[in-house]
């Protein structure tokens, strides 16, 4: 999924998102021969979107017919590819967290209705 040596991986928890975002950002513009992430960026947004869609589908399939462990593995792939997509369009995790915070405590039905106005 990423090119981070295990020795420098942050501990499990929310801070891993910021660490992964920093690694992903560092791969933008890098030589595609040096990392999978750089290769994805080099292939363009269409390929990034395609990979995200494939991984989202795979987590759905895993939820239907595979083990919880496979759902976890596929979910990590979805998050990684989503974060590559965010980076490609210039969105940081903080912006997504802010939007989630804005919506928190609002009914999903009410939030969706407000978007139609």
From Swiss-Prot:
GO terms for molecular function: ATP binding; phosphoribosyl-ATP diphosphatase activity. It comes from the Bacteria. It is found in: Cytoplasm. The keyword Nucleotide-binding applies. One of its GO terms (cellular component) is cytoplasm. One of its GO terms (biological process) is L-histidine biosynthetic process. Keywords: Amino-acid biosynthesis, ATP-binding, Cytoplasm, Histidine biosynthesis, Hydrolase, Nucleotide-binding. It is an enzyme of class 3 (hydrolase). The keyword Hydrolase applies. It holds the Pfam family PRA-PH. Pathway: Amino-acid biosynthesis; L-histidine biosynthesis; L-histidine from 5-phospho-alpha-D-ribose 1-diphosphate: step 2/9. Disulfide bonds: none annotated. Its EC number is 3.6.1.31. SUPFAM superfamilies: all-alpha NTP pyrophosphatases. It catalyses: 1-(5-phospho-beta-D-ribosyl)-ATP + H2O = 1-(5-phospho-beta-D-ribosyl)-5'-AMP + diphosphate + H(+). Belongs to the PRA-PH family. This is Phosphoribosyl-ATP pyrophosphatase.
């Amino acid at each position: 999924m990423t090119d981070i040596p295990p020795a420098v991986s942050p501990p499990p928890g929310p801070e891993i998102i910021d660490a992964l975002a920093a690694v992903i950002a560092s791969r933008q513009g890098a030589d595609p021969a040096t990392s999978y992430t750089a290769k994805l960026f080099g292939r363009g947004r269409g390929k990034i979107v395609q990979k995200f869609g494939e991984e989202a589908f795979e987590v759905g399939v895993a939820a239907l017919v595979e083990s919880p462990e496979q759902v976890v593995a596929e979910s990590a792939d979805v998050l990684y590819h989503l974060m590559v997509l965010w980076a490609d369009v210039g969105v940081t995790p903080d912006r997504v967290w802010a939007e989630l915070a804005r919506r928190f405590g609002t009914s999903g039905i009410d939030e969706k209705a407000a978007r139609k106005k």
